[in-house]
Amino acid sequence: MAARTRLSLLLPQNLPRFGHLKLVHTEAVAKEPAYPPIVPSLTAKSNSARRRQIEEQVKKISASPVEEKLSLITRIQRLKFVVYPQTFARNADKWYQHLTKTAYVPGLPEKSAQDAKTVGDDAFADIRSLVTRVILHEHLQTRKRKPFLYRHQEQLVGPFLKNLVIALTHSLAKYNPVLQRSSLDISPQVNFYWRRGKRIIPKGHRRGRPEPIRFQIDDNPHSQIRITEQLPQFAPLEASYSAEVPEITLAPNLMPLFRRQYENNIFTGAKLPDPACYGHTQFHLVPDRFHRDRMSREQQSDQVEVFLRANGLASLFAWTGAQAMYQGFWNHEDVTRPFVSQAVITDGHFFSFFCYQLNTVALSVETDANNPRKNILWGTESLRLYESVEDKEVVGLNDAVIKLLVQFLMNQP
């Protein structure tokens, strides 16, 4: 039987020390995975599967051409809130600012007034006489019968605005070459569809699931001018970071807005291959129910400008947003440059002027979380073009309104 020996725990004196040894850190060799990564199922009924379905759909839309992209975005039809540009809801402009993430700035942008080319005194005198002739023509030389019920603006003021727009566009084309290559649409149709906010489905077989809140604008301006080149921005994108947008926590049906289910549309007034794909200026007529005197008698004078602001905001947001969609931008691919448009709203006597700059179309809950951009609307108060027509003369013709019309139409890239 072998004898057991006791080993000493102390190091022997003759062993070398560790001080002269250097430890070298070597990187571990990264091994390629032998199997593909584990991803959630596309068919399972789980939150992870739903997230993967959304990611795959976003990749598919982003890789598609513009025409197919618009079809994929508007393909699924659900109940959506229909936003009417001309609404008599109280304080509708605040609601529309929240739904479109738009900040309102009183007055017109300074850059627009500085960059706009001006016409000479002789040319302005010709334009002033032209506006006078158009007004006198509608009052003295046009045979007018009594209009149908609730069609006074369409049948009496509509022809005046049409003649005014055509005459001014034709006269200023010699000073603004962009108007020579422009396209003038009469009674066009403009549509825009977007998502903003989310809700929990209260009932039905989809009860308890989160759902984005959908909105649709179907607008019918009196006329609009489209051009082949994009108008310059009124302000840099970074200028919108500090703008304030009203925050409304109430549901849209309390405005009130009503939900309908029909085809989702995104349309600028022209088809996708049209070279005049950028907006210049829209012209709108107020409805027959809009009476300044009646609203004053009902102690709603403060809602006159609210109505006009809401109209300008919704119409320009729909038109400018559709232009951005035509260029391939959408909710998950935000705009890389601002899109701008202008609008004029009138009842034949009073004119309101608005400028809109679209800085973002990422309005859904997922894309708006860390998005400091905001859209901006500039607008003026109502300005009266003339007082009346007496003895074949226009009384009180306002040169400031004519100058603003010229300034809008002289805007060019």
What positions do the PLM features span?
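Charge-rich, low-complexity intrinsically disordered linkers/tails
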Residues: 2-304, 379-413
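Internal, well-ordered interaction modules that form the hydrophobic cores of assembly/scaffold domains
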Residues: 296-365
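Polybasic, proline/glycine-rich intrinsically disordered low-complexity segments
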Residues: 352-389
